[in-house]
Amino acid sequence: MILRLSLFVSACFMIPIQASAEQYFVKNQLEYFAAEKKVEAGDVITLANGVWNDFEITFSGAGTKEQPITLTAEDPGKVILSGQSNLRIGGKYMVVSGLVFKDGFSPTGEIVSFRRSSTDLASHSRVTNVVIDRFSKPDRFEADLWVGMYGKHNRFDHNHVAGKSNKGVTFAVRLTTPESQQNFHRIDHNYFGPRQTLGSNGGETLRIGTSHFADTNSNTTVENNYFDRTDGEVEIISSKSGKNILRGNVFFESSGTLTLRHGDGNLVEKNVFIGNGKDHTGGIRVINRDQIVRDNYMEGLRGDGFASALTIMNGVPNSPANRYVEVENATIENNSVVDSARITFGAGADAERSVACLLYTSPSPRDS
């Protein structure tokens, strides 16, 4: 089978600049922070090529849809943020592109944060063509996030994120305040590269929400991403909120599943799972109400139980939202499972998870 993947074409986009817009070319941190204090809609800050060591970037302002404020590299890929470095974005209509994080780690709990502070969240902002390469804490048991997404209407696209070796979710959509809920974020066309097995919870590659916000809608779209051997834990993507769209993603030899852990009304469609016979590779795990799972392709998966090619969980009677809500009113249709070890219905059945789902099948077109 040949998969034609067009995920990593560089995003070429034009940013219109008014005659009054300022171009700041900066060669050190003092010059950067002086420019960052002055930027207005349409302005561009360009970092000079080279290694920027121990650089904690804050980037906030008031751009517009037509005139975003941009932080970029002199040449994409040639601005290296090393040592103890990170990036915090606030304001609105801000764009960051072309930076590389490697040979270091964040001194805080996040490398890239879509908030400058608890009161300055990013909105309508974008991080694109950025690399985070093995930028892990030295102590593998010290947790952090590599990307924390807050605010609303933000986009993370065409980035390379690989090699996390310490505890903590690689990418988390945070719903901690109303200002970050029903956010309509987009996470698309990214490469999520190998992550070693953590051996405990907290090793997801992507988590949308947490159990504290299980009844909250996130309205986040995750599409056209490539998950390459992301083996952190059994949940590669953990959707813990409602009304999310997970579409057109590829999971290549990744141990674990796309899991609808909490939240109702999610859509999972047109994803491809290729296991190539690797142990513990799985597909989709379904929990909660009103989920739609359609037109997905699963081949060569060897996981079973919670990591089967398709897993339908048993529920807890009258379950609170943060436990195991029974699968109800789910639509699971037009999915293909090829050369895979297991499809599991009633997974996790025990004295607590005692509610099985009722299955209804539609007639095959050949039977009509």
Where are these regions (language model features)?
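Sec-dependent signal peptide recognition
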Residues: 2-8
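Cleavable N-terminal signal peptides
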Residues: 8-9, 19
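Right-handed parallel beta-helix/beta-solenoid
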Residues: 19-34, 49-51, 74-75
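Residues at the C-termini of beta-strands that transition into short coil/loop
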Residues: 30, 72-75, 85, 105
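Beta-solenoid repeat scaffold
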Residues: 39-80, 87-98, 120-125
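Glycine- and acidic/polar-rich repeat regions and solenoidal domains
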Residues: 56-57, 83-90, 102-125, 132-362, ...
